[in-house]
Design a protein with these regions (language model features):
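Alpha-helix initiation/capping motif
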Residues: 21, 31, 79-80, 89-90, ...
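Short, basic interhelical loop/turn and adjoining N-cap
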Residues: 54, 85-99
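Short recognition patches in nucleic-acid-associated and regulatory proteins
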Residues: 13-27
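Short Lys/Arg-enriched helix C-cap and helix-to-coil transition segments
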Residues: 99-127
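Generic structural signal of hydrophobic/aromatic residues within well-ordered alpha-helices
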Residues: 65-69, 94-97, 114, 118
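Repeat-unit-sized solenoid/scaffold elements
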Residues: 73-91, 112-123
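Polybasic, low-complexity binding patches
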Residues: 23-34, 44-85
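Short cysteine-rich loop/turn motifs with clustered Cys
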Residues: 1-15, 39-41
């Protein structure tokens, strides 16, 4: 338990939640950007991100994270250094993240890197 307020409702007794699940992108296990403080209600209740009816909140958190990545990665092509300056992950985690991607002469294509970070998919607003 952490002493940060819940980033969704402001509640107390927060727990750290991986926005992109570890099974979807192991490279982000220790990435601070991928962690969010949630109170037990927003984390584990039926309407929390892990709850039966929590899909909407989970989708919103993922979309917010993706939008943050789109702002932080503001160039069309990204080098390993630029990616690691943002993610701050280990060299081996970075290597594992980028292994499936094709490196162009200029670097890795921005949208491919973001898709890889997001667990292999991009999220859109639900109306």
């Amino acid at each position: 338990m952490y002493f940060r307020p819940c980033e969704v409702c402001g509640g107390v007794g927060s727990e750290l939640h991986h926005i992109i699940r570890r099974s979807h992108c192991r490279a982000l296990i220790h990435c601070e950007l991928n962690l969010i403080a949630l109170c037990p209600k927003c984390h584990r209740s039926s309407k929390g991100v892990h709850g039966k009816h929590g899909h909407e909140l989970d989708h919103k958190l993922k979309l917010d994270f993706q939008n943050k990545l789109e702002m932080l990665f503001d160039k069309e092509y990204l080098t390993e250094e630029i990616i690691n300056d943002v993610l701050k992950i280990s060299d081996s985690a970075l290597k594992g993240l980028l292994k499936p991607l094709k490196r162009e002469k200029e670097g890795y294509e921005r949208i491919s890197v973001i898709r890889q970070i997001m667990g292999g998919r991009l999220y859109e607003w639900k109306y």
